[in-house]
C-alpha cells in the first residue's frame, strides 16, 4: 500500500502547476515562521529540496536572517544521516540527486530545537511515507525536539503506520 501511495503522490508532485506550487510554498513558509516551535528555536534543521518538494530555501534564508543556526542533512551510511551546518559553498550533489554538505561537523541531536521533516505523503496522525530509505524514521526515533512538515493538499493520504514509523508533531498543508 505504501508503495502505491508513494508512486501516485510522486507522480502528482511531478506534474503540479509551478506557479501554484510557488505560491503555496510562500504561504507555508510564512506559517512556519509564525509557528511557536520555530519562534523559540535557535537551531533549525531542514532539507535541501528536490525540484518537486516544498522549496525550503525561503525558510533557510529567513532563519539565517533571524540569526538562527541552520542545519541540513548528510547521508553518512546505509539508512544513517546527520545534520551539518548549512553552507552553500560546501554543497555537493549526493547519490540520491539532492544537495548535501561535502563535509562538516555533525550537530548533536540534543542541540537541534526544530526539525523540518520532508515526506511524500502524511496521514492524519502525522505519520509519513518518505522515499523509502528510512533515514528520518531512524534519526527521529530518539529525537526529543520539535518536528514540523510542510506538504501540499494532495499529499494527505490515509494509511496504516508501521512499528518503526515515527510521526511528526505538526503537518502544515496548502
Segments the model singles out, each with a brief description of its role:
Residues 1-100, 104-106, 110:
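N-terminal active-site beta-alpha-beta segment that forms phosphate/nucleotide-binding
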Residues 49, 120, 151:
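Short glycine-/small-residue-rich Rossmann-like dinucleotide-binding loops
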Residues 46-48, 117-118, 173:
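Redox-cofactor binding/interface segments in oxidoreductases and associated redox assembly factors
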Residues 2-4, 11-15, 110-115, 123-127, ...:
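Surface-exposed, charge/polar-rich loops and edge strands
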Residues 95, 124, 128-132:
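Short glycine/serine/threonine-biased micro-segments
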Residues 118-119, 132:
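A short beta-strand-loop-alpha-helix capping motif that often carries His-Thr
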Amino acid at each position: 500500500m505504501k508503495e502505491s501511495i508513494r508512486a501516485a503522490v510522486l507522480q502528482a508532485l511531478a506534474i503540479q502547476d509551478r506557479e501554484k506550487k510557488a505560491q503555496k510554498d510562500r504561504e507555508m513558509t510564512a506559517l512556519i515562521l509564525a509557528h511557536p516551535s520555530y519562534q523559540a528555536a535557535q537551531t533549525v534543521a531542514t532539507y535541501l529540496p528536490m525540484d518537486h518538494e516544498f522549496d525550503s530555501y525561503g525558510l533557510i534564508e529567513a532563519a539565517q536572517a533571524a540569526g538562527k543556526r541552520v542545519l541540513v542533512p548528510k547521508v553518512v551510511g546505509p539508512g544513517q544521516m546527520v545534520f551539518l551546518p548549512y553552507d552553500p559553498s560546501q554543497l555537493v550533489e549526493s547519490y540520491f540527486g539532492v544537495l548535501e554538505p561535502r563535509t562538516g561537523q555533525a550537530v548533536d541531536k540534543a542541540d537541534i530545537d526544530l526539525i523540518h521533516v520532508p515526506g511524500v505523503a502524511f496521514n492524519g496522525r502525522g505519520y509519513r511515507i518518505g522515499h523509502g530509505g528510512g533515514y528520518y524514521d531512524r534519526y527521529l526515533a530518539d529525537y526529543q525536539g520539535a518536528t514540523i512538515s510542510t506538504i501540499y493538499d494532495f499529499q494527505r493520504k490515509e494509511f496504516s503506520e508501521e512499528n518503526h514509523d515515527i510521526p511528526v508533531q505538526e503537518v502544515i498543508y496548502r
